[in-house]
Swiss-Prot record:
UniProt organism field: Human herpesvirus 8 type P (isolate GK18)
Gene: K4.2
Protein name: Protein K4.2
Length: 182
């Protein structure tokens, strides 16, 4: 399973679930996203993290997750997983693409290429909201002894949400945001 980050001008793309701190310097959320990427890669439940995207502070502006076609976990009952460019293949997200490419923080290059995950429905959106909420809550907790406990809670919430999604079969009906699943 391959997890990729949005490409930022002048900064290499992070792949395979880990980042080099030197490539994403001054990134306050590095530790959190690094943990999430590692957990997603090795837990077999990476699909839930695909919905995490958006404009984040500093050098993290425009981080997005994607799961490449054909590299998905067979345990997740998605009929199709696909990746597309926000700007050209999903016009309904053009406004977000414009936001990503024009709203970088001072001194940070705008996003030049961004890929999002196709396959998440309302449940996956809930996951992304929860994760972003915990990102805010744990913003000042890095280096503290209890950060591992916070990460553990985040991961368990993600797993519980996936179980809920699988149990109710929401994803089997397709994702209205994802043209490839219609």
């Amino acid at each position: 399973m391959q997890i990729s980050f949005a490409e930022v001008l002048g900064k290499p793309v992070g792949r395979a679930g880990f980042l080099d701190r030197g490539k994403w310097d001054r990134c306050p959320l590095y530790d959190l996203f690094s943990h999430l990427a590692t957990s997603a890669t090795f837990s077999g439940t990476a699909s839930g993290f695909g919905a995490v995207s958006g404009v984040l502070p500093g050098s993290c502006s425009g981080i997005a997750w994607s799961i490449k076609p054909g590299n998905y976990d067979p345990l997740i009952p998605f009929e199709t997983l696909m990746t597309w460019d926000i700007g050209s293949k999903n016009p309904r997200l053009t406004k977000y693409w414009t936001l990503l490419t024009t709203s970088a923080a001072p001194g940070v290059s705008p996003v030049s290429s961004c890929f999002v995950f196709g396959g998440g429905g309302r449940g996956e959106c809930l996951v992304s909201v929860l994760l972003l909420f915990f990102c805010v809550c744990t913003f000042g907790c890095f280096g503290k002894p209890y950060r591992c406990a916070i990460f553990w809670v985040i991961h368990k919430l993600h797993l519980a949400t996936l179980v809920f999604i699988v149990a109710f079969g929401e994803e089997k009906r397709g994702d209205p945001w994802s043209p490839g699943l219609q």
